[in-house]
Amino acid sequence: MIASESTTHVEQYQDIFKRLAGAINEHLELKQDLDESKVRGIVDEAVAAARLPRPVEVHMPDGTVNTLSERTHRQFEQVLSLIGEGHSNIMLVGPAGTGKTTLVKHAAKALGRSFAFISLSAGVTETHIFGRMLPQSDGTWAYVESPFIRIYRNGGVFLFDEVDAADGNVMVSINAALANGVLCNPVNGEVIERHADCVIVAAANTYGRGGDMVYVGRNALDGATLDRFVLSKINVGYDTDLEADMATAVGSKGQALVDWVNRLRDRIADNRLRRIASTRLVEQGVKALSAGRTLEDVKSRFFQDWSADEKSKVGEEA
């Protein structure tokens, strides 16, 4: 399968320059003064108009073309490539807020398949994954299928989110379903064959080797579990292009926000701080700026629970 944008990056930049030239010529013809603020306004309008989401066309092996109108993560094609290679188990590893869940959801939509997910917190048990037996009005008990079993049986894309936070016994129960192509449901004893179009994705903040400096409470995953994802792991980073697109909604203020977030990430990494500056910071920052708040307001909110030493290390006043 092949994913392609209906408009190339070259065409996109040509569109930006064309819009800029047209707007500036219009001002010159009207003999209007072009001060710095007007030039900034023209640039902001041109860039915002040219960076609207471009439809993505996914060409399926049977010749059909699925079109995705939403803006996709820059690693979207990597996920589709692994599926195209025949990988039915995929692992996405990356910091919080990089868009892993949305990335998988978009992949399912592009493939024309159903999508479901579960976050594997410590309280999740086998019944959440494999279904449960519930009492009926006539006094009997009936099995109620879970979203995972439905997709395993009928095809689709299922996401196990936060797998490095899961109970170890739960992951062992999932192992057979990941590798053997068949599952003996521990709830009702039914043997279910895995559908050929069933893709199972595991998302984590670590590589399953235990907690690290930031994600302290993460569990180590069993070696048998990790082996299910050999050659099908993707390190998912922040999509700075997507963040820049978000920021165009507030013009030059948005660019200042993005520049600050990028510098902040570098300083967090350089000083090995247990802090996160995710895409959500950009998203919520754009909302605040759109509502009339300033970048200083955004910073004040973000740093309210930081220590003076932490602020100093990232270049902010205590």
Question: Where are these predicted regions, by residue range?
Answer:
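C-terminal regulatory/interaction module of P-loop NTP-utilizing enzymes
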Residues: 1-318
